[in-house]
Amino acid sequence: MNYIIIQKEKEIFKLNIKDIYYIQMHPSKAHTVQIVTEDASFALFQNLSKLEKQYGETLTRCHRNCLVNLEWLKSIDIQSKTLFLGEEGRYAVQYARRRYRDISQKWLKQGE
């Protein structure tokens, strides 16, 4: 499945997984994730673990509350444990120390 269907108020969006920068748990809404793309941010009533199982080929767990699309990863700051995503690295996401090796290996293997 290459798309996520999102309903936002009275509109329905078909969002391509490759357009997603990252997905994180919503800071204020329980059982809701926040999906961030270049153009917009969407809230979806969904479990992060289920999204990881469905889209694990494209999205990688970087923290217990966040999945990232490594295709959009521009740089990794090892000291601050931050991933910079987006066209110019505008989006900053924290990663867990124990996930660094997995993230860096997958990122460096991309495009081979």
Predicted regions and their residues:
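Basic, polyanion-interacting recognition surfaces, primarily
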Residues: 1-112
